[in-house]
From Swiss-Prot:
This is Probable zinc metalloprotease UREG_01421. It comes from the Eukaryota. It comes from Uncinocarpus reesii (strain UAMH 1704). The keyword Transcription regulation does not apply. Its cofactor is Zn(2+). GO terms for biological process: proteolysis. The lineage of its organism: Eukaryota, Fungi, Dikarya, Ascomycota, Pezizomycotina. GO terms for cellular component: extracellular region.
Amino acid sequence: MHSLSSALAGSTFVLLFLCLLASAQPLTTPNPARALPDALTGGSSIFSCPAASWPPTRIGSPNRPQRPSRELRSILSQISHKRIEASILKLVSFGTRHTLSTQTNATHGIGAARDWIASEFKRYADASDGRLSVDVIGYEQQPDGNRIPFPVRISDVVATLKGTEEPERIYLISGHYDSRVTDVNDYTSFAPGANDDASGVAVSLELARVMSQPHFPRPRATLVFAAVAGEEQGLYGSRFLAETYRNKSANIEGMFTNDIVGSSTADDGTRDPHVVRLFGQGLPPLTVEDQKQRETRLTIGGENDTPARQLSRFVKETAENEHTDMRVSVIYRLDRYLRGGDHRPFLEAGYPAARFTEPHENFAHQHQDVRVETDPKTGRKKQYGDLPEFCDFRYIARVGKVNAAALWSLANSPGMPRNVRVSTRDLSNDSKFFWDPPVGGNEGVGGYEIVWRSTVAPFWTHVLDVGMAREATVDLSKDNVIFGIRARGKNGERGVAVLPFPA
């Protein structure tokens, strides 16, 4: 009995090891165009796991990465690293953008930064033939006994590119324009915040500029480009923005924050210029899913198939190609240890959200007083501070392209199917599914697809087209794989998959 258990355990370990080895996504990729020839050229799927191909099936076909449309390729080609650099340098020029800094000086402090960001968005709006609208929204934050010692105005700058067919379906990106130094409440010292987070604001600005141009078709769904304040003091601006949308019952089907996306170089000098991390949360907060829903999710093994992780899978399928020249390293957790970001308030409001961050971080260039220190042992001098000289502007432009590929694909594909269920009324070796159309109905939907993967595979490996049906039975046991249902547009664009719950 002992030897049999050992053999089974060994076999299980070997299978799991081979699967993880086959599906591993290493962070270090000096040239992803060479490291990922299949994904970037449309060959065999990178989302497969050869060691996890059991159970065998003859139905469906391999799930392939989604290729960018002609319009998307044109958009990606116009994202400019020089404009991104100019935006970051301008934001740094305000001296400090600390949330508690002056809001009345025209050239210094967070108020000047806010007004400049709004003026840039408005300049793009003026050139957009009425497509882009700009709002500055905010509220008075009272002292919190911690990082807000006195009342302060928190302002978010929001540019909206309204969709043509489904304007009520929204996708949003943000960066935070406030900055800080070592002392989180020091609002007078020079706080350049080039990487954290002028880089993310520059991405929002550049995508708004490019996507709102009149010669591009407007997206089917609405895109929002935001710059928020108060992140360093407690995610205040993002929380206000998320609550504003939630109070309007807005249908936000995806949100991304770009926070610290300015450099590809680690503190030891390691460079990884073609990788960006994407953090996707597992179990939603209990304020979003109640205890019964959570217990059901855990019972069916759906903890890795939350809306945030489905959104992250979509990004990987749409944003890894030769036009972005990037690999998306999906990290299955909310955020880094001891850190937080502006996607969290959106998750807490019930919206799918994820965070983009550079592959390696140099903490000498984050949350630091600008200074030079000499190592007493080596005599070498070390520069501290979040200065623009440590930014890689071409890298930031590539991160912008990843965002653009995801946003444009999301906005031009159908929304997520609703009420996705799998029948559990009887014991059966097949799987029967039911679903309702997306919130916007079947307008623009060209069909539905059932996707699946091994329970140990990170990404969808198989797909089956079932046409316009709203129920389908698959000759594959729901006990052995993870399923999802997604809509496909008449334009061929595939949407985000949804995990079926028992019915």
